[in-house]
């Protein structure tokens, strides 16, 4: 059995684009959670740096993550996000070391 693929996506909004980025990210949550390979999808905003968002993500495997990236709603977000992001999205993959 494969270990889940767990990651944090770090997204920093351009000045004046914080709300647009937040709304775009919030719009991804419901359809992503309905994907058969999704295990976790939760959005956070950094307290001391408003406009910096972290999406905690877990998918059952690489194929499930690839399927997520190919969805029409993620593709729409990715196309729009270029205008909202101050720097390229950073995707940090994590390895669980405790229960």
Task: Show which residues each predicted segment covers.
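Glycine-rich beta-strand-turn "strand-cap" elements at beta-sheet edges
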Residues: 1-5, 43-49, 79-99
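N-terminal first-folded block
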Residues: 5-35, 39
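Short, well-ordered beta-strand segments in beta-rich or mixed alpha/beta enzyme
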Residues: 5-12, 42-69
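Short loop segments at secondary-structure junctions
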Residues: 14-16, 60, 97
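Short, structured helix-loop boundary elements
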Residues: 18, 22, 52, 71-74
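An amphipathic, aromatic/His-enriched active-site/gating alpha helix that lines ligand/cofactor pockets
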Residues: 27, 31-39, 58-92
